Amino acid sequence: MILNVVMVEPEIPQNTGNVARTCALTGARLHLVGPMGFKIDDRKLKRAGLDYWHLLDITYYENLEEFFRKNPDNGNFYYFTTKATHRHTDVKYPDNVYLFFGKETKGLPENLLHDNPQTSVRIPMLNNPDARSLNLSNSVAIGVYEVLRQWDYPKLLCEGKLRDYERDV
């Protein structure tokens, strides 16, 4: 089972750093598709990802054309957008899946969504013209954990343990 997160033209380094941390801690592969609104060595990006960068499987692409050339669609690409009619929870995600997320200000390219209406999905939210979209890194986390939930959280630690400590009584 391989979970891939594809960020198309991300603009805000802190969001990308948060997504990198989510990917590192869930075993998801991160694909960054340019052009990006920041440099890879941006300190805000590194800070948001904390000290998890060594755990991350990350690949960079100059543009979508390069990404699609190196990663052909085998019916396993899902496009997260506010413009979709299908909910992200209505999909049965395959064992090798790619979740696409667009830039913070515009989302995914319209032509990509027009060409893939059956695999475009949305995360439900309020029907309010002032509420355009969820934060990008939050949307990625919601999508990633829905896939992992369906897969029964493979390789993830699902039970925690409190540390022993003495209570003041």
Residue ranges and their predicted role:
Residues 1-169:
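Post-transcriptional modification and biogenesis factors for structured RNAs
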